Amino acid sequence: MEILLNDVEVRVLGCLIEKELATPEYYPLTLNSLTTACNQKSNRDPVMALEESEVVRALDGLKMKHVAIQAADSGRVPRYRHILSERLRFSPAELAILAELLLRGPQTLGELRTRAERMHPFADLAAVEQVLGELAERTPPLVMRLPRQPGRKESRFAHLLAGEPDLSAEERTAPPEGARLQVMAENERIAALELEVATLRAEVGELRQVMEEFRSQFE
């Protein structure tokens, strides 16, 4: 099954997969939680500032492409989940790698192993490479190895759910220096804490809404 997504659909699908694997206790996601996940600053490249209406349109697109649905048991507050596993029979390892590529774009084997750890453990780089090979061998292929950039020692891999990446743009992107990488790592840790607080606040707000609706039945 060929899938072609736009940039917002890529972000929404990546977030649905990530949260299923990393925080299953909060999955499926409400629209509020999904929008927060799409806009978080950690583990995202590029960082986005999407409105809920944009996320709704992306969800509609994913539904039409048969990769996401509204959960049947979502209750009073609608919740959403992806259905890639049902349609394409992905393993957890394949989903973790695919989610990381959807959320952060092209990455090396080492980057994928480290960053996907929160979703699925990989014993070594060979395990990551094996999963990438399996995704590349599907019909149609879901990932590809990019030509190595000048100044980089390792090749990177990209997903193909939005079509082939613009290689001319890739060539213009210089690798970040060591100090910049350190700052980026620190920013990610801070952003991760901010996201956790925002997620908890969203869940509390939703619980309050449900309680108020329940209480109103007896007034």
Swiss-Prot record:
Listed transmembrane segments: none
Family annotation (SUPFAM superfamilies): Winged helix' DNA-binding domain
InterPro entries: DUF480, WH-like_DNA-bd_sf, WH_DNA-bd_sf
One Pfam family here: DUF480
Family per record: Belongs to the UPF0502 family.
Record-given protein name: UPF0502 protein GSU0233
